[in-house]
């Protein structure tokens, strides 16, 4: 086995520390993002992760390029640090035997096959639990292991569309927009790693493993959070407000006199008063009945945001960022990845 990618700076930072999952061994049969990010979190916490890949081609994410480093796609590098990799033909008797011998030495088993595939390969939960009852077995799939939709294929962008996340993003007068990140994959993977850690703790007490069933659909529903509760509360979906926030004003991006953008967020009345009184020297905006309370500012969002836009257009971005921070207002320059 060889290390396929190691974050050297991370290793240097933690090499003198005791990590909470040291001594835990994970057999990782997952690929792309959700499963690999789950096991990468476990590796970062000290677990030894053995990644199983297809002979000749490996994880599909190796080929997701450009860009690439040393022939490896950026997707693969993003979600597979601190792991050991071995190529195994699981469809062969020898390959299956190797998987079983590895599983016998592991505490955790993670897979993200479509439901039914693990059983056909002979590495499903029931089979492994019968052989290794202490093994924590985590399945990551699109719609879960059971139910009328369990056999459907699914990827992050589809769930962003299907579960309503896209409908929340975009300008009020435009259509839905997909956030350009694999948000559902990432959230689902964190739920999976959290569940695995909880199951490991239970394993230490009971001596038994368990089957963890994590789905992208469940992750997508959870991501909706307060947006879902907004709908349950009033029966209407939250409006699209571009870079703003449906129930909090002011939140958004503003341009300074130099065209530079900065972002501020006043989530409490105290922060709002810091903005208009301390930073802008406009106590009248704190006293105006239209803007004095959060409900009024939400109702009069367009008028209020226009007032702020006019004020901020008088000075360059950096002037405002410094002044807002001095006043205790959460803010920051809008940067691209080069600048960040």
Task: Describe these PLM feature segments.
Residues 89, 111, 214-217, 264-266:
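Active-site-adjacent beta-strand anchor residues
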Residues 250-327, 331, 338-339:
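Aromatic-enriched alpha-helical interface/lid elements that frame and gate functional surfaces
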Residues 189-209, 222-234, 277-282:
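Oxidoreductase and adenylate-handling cofactor-binding alpha/beta cores
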Residues 2-208, 240:
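N-terminal helix-loop segment corresponding to the beta1-alpha1 unit
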Residues 177-187, 209-211, 241-245, 249-251, ...:
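A short glycine-threonine-serine/GTX helix/turn-capping micro-motif
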Residues 209-217, 323:
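Beta-strand segments within the central parallel beta-sheet cores of soluble alpha/beta enzyme folds
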Residues 220, 339-340:
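Beta-rich nucleic-acid/ligand-interaction surfaces
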Residues 67, 76, 241-246, 252-253, ...:
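Short Gly/Pro-enriched turn/cap motifs at secondary-structure boundaries
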């Amino acid at each position: 086995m060889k290390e396929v990618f190691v974050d050297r700076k991370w290793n240097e930072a933690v090499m003198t520390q005791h990590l909470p999952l040291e001594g835990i061994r994970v057999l990782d049969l997952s690929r792309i993002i959700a499963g690999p990010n789950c096991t990468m979190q476990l590796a970062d916490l000290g677990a030894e992760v053995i990644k199983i890949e297809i002979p000749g081609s490996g994880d599909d994410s190796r080929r997701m390029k450009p860009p690439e480093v040393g022939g490896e796609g950026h997707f693969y590098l993003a979600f597979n640090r601190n792991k050991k990799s071995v190529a195994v033909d699981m469809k062969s008797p020898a390959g299956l035997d190797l998987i079983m011998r590895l599983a016998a030495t592991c505490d955790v088993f993670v897979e993200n096959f479509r439901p039914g595939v693990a059983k056909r390969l002979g590495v499903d939960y029931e089979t492994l639990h019968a052989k290794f009852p202490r093994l924590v077995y985590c399945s990551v799939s699109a719609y879960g292991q059971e139910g009328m939709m369990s056999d459907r294929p699914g990827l992050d962008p589809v769930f962003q569309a299907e579960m309503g996340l896209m409908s929340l993003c975009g300008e009020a007068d435009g259509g839905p927009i997909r956030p350009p990140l694999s948000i559902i994959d990432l959230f689902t993977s964190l739920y999976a790693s959290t569940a695995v850690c909880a199951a490991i703790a239970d394993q230490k007490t009971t001596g038994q493993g368990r089957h963890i069933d994590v789905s992208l659909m469940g992750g997508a529903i959870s991501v909706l959070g307060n947006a879902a509760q907004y709908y349950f509360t009033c029966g209407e979906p939250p409006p699209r407000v571009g870079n703003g926030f449906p129930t909090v004003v002011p939140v958004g991006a503003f341009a300074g006199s130099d065209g530079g953008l900065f972002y501020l967020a006043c989530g409490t009345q105290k922060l709002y008063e810091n903005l208009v009184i301390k930073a802008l020297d406009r106590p009248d905006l704190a006293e105006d009945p239209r803007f004095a309370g959060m409900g009024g500012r939400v109702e009069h969002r367009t008028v209020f945001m226009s007032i702020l836009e006019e004020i901020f257009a008088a000075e360059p971005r950096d002037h405002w960022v410094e002044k807002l921070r001095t006043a205790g207002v959460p803010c920051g320059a809008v940067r691209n990845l080069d600048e960040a």
